[in-house]
């Protein structure tokens, strides 16, 4: 195991050699100080994927998301420009909008009825004409950086951040190659869970298929593990494997070059292009604290009227596949606090980078360090 400092810093070359690597120490998954450090270092300075563009496609459409305690509202203006703001009134700090839906042409604070245009500028503050030196320019909503990229919506709390493409170079082209219809996807189902697991625990689980055989029999019946690869691309990775039809999970015509594409995006989003044409699933992680993560598991199809097979597949995800992963990460989170856990685990990365190799975890842990 590595020599580790008693605080929450790791050697810069941590996990640099996947074939001789150990996991991040358990305390990084369970300690509030570690989480506070990550909130500022990672989440306040990274592009976070929050939704597919179809959720806010029309003027006045809005959604809200909560990330590291910050509530963000994303709204498309009457000028068709999509913007993000901290969801807080600059007057006394009250939240402006909740949930999602169709905003009126002005956003009105429910506390004192200050009203804001959809571009964030102040429309009206009651009695402001009688307040000395009232400056409407200092009473606007505070913007959050936003980009639409590869069909999805990304936000960044760092106003000086470079582009999404700078963080995830080449990702957009690869996603479009895997799913040419990505811009036409429509949300068909969402499973939201407040998962009792650290966000890194959930990412670890996604970044290896070592567990697929024992824990996901339906998925493993479709994926061809001997034709499965995991490649690293800086702050994103790609798991790619050929698929075969299965009565337990994915049903499609045999003889096609059907494949799985599993994209992990720094820090904690997962895009899954399935063997079913015109289908994609996305796992959005929104960390709450060191041992809790809000997850949206979204299923998308290009068609609005679902077929019976699509409905059955949604049920399989809801009742079988999704619970399998939730049970795993919840159990691991408990085990990381056990006296019987030695504090770090050996990363099972083999020399060939096979379909069951855990080199993806080593890559992720090196980025976290």
Regions inferred by a protein language model and the residue ranges of each:
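Short Pro/Gly-enriched beta-strand edge/turn motifs at strand-loop
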Residues: 45-55, 125-129, 264-269
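Generic structural signal for secondary-structure transition and capping sites
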Residues: 43-47, 94, 211
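Non-catalytic accessory segments flanking enzyme active sites
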Residues: 24, 28-67
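Rieske [2Fe-2S] iron-sulfur-binding domain
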Residues: 55-159, 163-173
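C-terminal catalytic domain of Rieske-type non-heme iron oxygenases
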Residues: 76, 87, 147, 152-369
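Short, contiguous pre-domain boundary segments
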Residues: 6, 11-26
